[in-house]
Amino acid sequence: MRNLYYETTLHKQIRDKRTNRKERIEKDIDSYGNDILVSDELKEAYDQTHHLWSTVGEHTLRVTASSVMICYALRKLGIKANIPAVVVGSLCHDLGILRRDEKYNSKRECSREHPVDSVKVAKEIIPDLTEQSADIIERHMWPAGSSRVPNSLEGVIVSVADKYAAVKDLIKGSDINNTGVRNTIQSEADRIREKHSK
């Protein structure tokens, strides 16, 4: 016999936990990334296609939400990551790609050069960009497209989240895309975009 009270209570706790996690993600991204979220560069990022089915802006927010979620998961294991550096690094990691057709002669050149260009754009938005955030941005292409390994755990987090989001972007619409994690990340990205586009 099923215990409906238990099931209802359990579902409510899970729902409350997910809502709390979403609110924490949004709070962290808003707190540490506000200057970037309101920047003209990130707004422009929504006008440029990226990974076939996405835009640079949508991809960026998925990477950021995924990165923060990884930080929370690691915290449960007793591993503390620098969330402000992760937020700044992930929000800026692909801003150098903007207007890529005007800057790069090939996809290979874009892949190789955009991390350095992204650091330059980040420094325009945040003049006192930390070395750690700059390293996260500059080395985010590892291991696909670059042999330059990130110098910090935070750099690895953003790099992994970037690859995860890129795969999700490429397979958008497939069954593998319809998971709770994907929906959480997408809803966070949508909510942040909506909030900052007003």
Model regions: which residues?
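Divalent metal-dependent phosphate-bond-processing catalytic cores, especially two-metal-ion Mg2+/Mn2+ enzymes
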Residues: 2-31, 48-81, 86, 92, ...
